[in-house]
Amino acid sequence: MATTAAAAAAADSTPLQVCGCKGIRTCLICERQRHGSPPWQRSPQKKHCFLYCPDTGWAMGPKDSDLEGWAFPFPGVTLIKDFVTPEEEAEMVRLMDSDPWKLSQSGRRKQDYGPKVNFRKQKLKMAGFQGLPSFSQKVVRRMGLYPGLEDFRPVEQCNLDYSPERGSAIDPHLDDAWLWGERLVSLSLLSATVVSMSREAPGSLLLSSAPALGPDALKGSIVAPSRSVPCQEVEVAISVPCRSLLVLTGAARHQWTHAIHRRHIQARRVCATFRELSSEFLPGGKQQELGQELLQAALSFQGRPV
């Protein structure tokens, strides 16, 4: 545990007065320089907050709130606790810190292992991409031991470094679906956080009585929803422990945006997100040859940040 604490307390080599924010994105550094309030203080907050329950797969109303006892199914989330050991965590962060971090938006720093991509024009090039880092080989192999990840072959890894001193956060967003495939897989290191899910869809979300016996408790019976809330006012909080693996698929991947609010970064957090190819780049797809080239490079595990 001492090694993990030492990694978490490692000095940030990036001067605090420098940030990588552009456009509407801000962090504590540029907010202080501009003497302005951050965008989230000017934006309306979600009125109906639910907590994701990994045991049931439902989004549950918090205790001691007007939503207590109400819930709705929230499919597409898998949370694997203690995916790596504290010793593996400390070694991974040590190796990440041995390479330079680049400034990114909203107080983050990043390291990219993947092709150079222009998502707007749907173009990509290898541009020096030589594969995922060597220290991820064991992690990727271990992923294949879990149900739903047996055939997961990542072609891109993005490391993000969050710091409370920089006011790090990431705005609600959906990951691209032209290049990246069905599963988004993220490994959280150094500290816990909360991933906040929201959906900017019209209409209402129907609520039922919270299940007591797991996701199959309501099978065989018809439960009429007895309450509804506007979908755009709902936020689902997924508690993500340190050293856990979070997998988003289906509706959680394609319909609900994911974000990390500034208030949920209480200590340094490093996240490694792994992405697979979409069907367009797999056998039978119109860009299968390029996809094969990307996979061969990625799974050589000889890469450095690009």
Ranges and model annotations:
Residues 1-306:
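Non-heme Fe(II) oxygenase metal-center motifs and adjacent flexible, charged/small-residue loops
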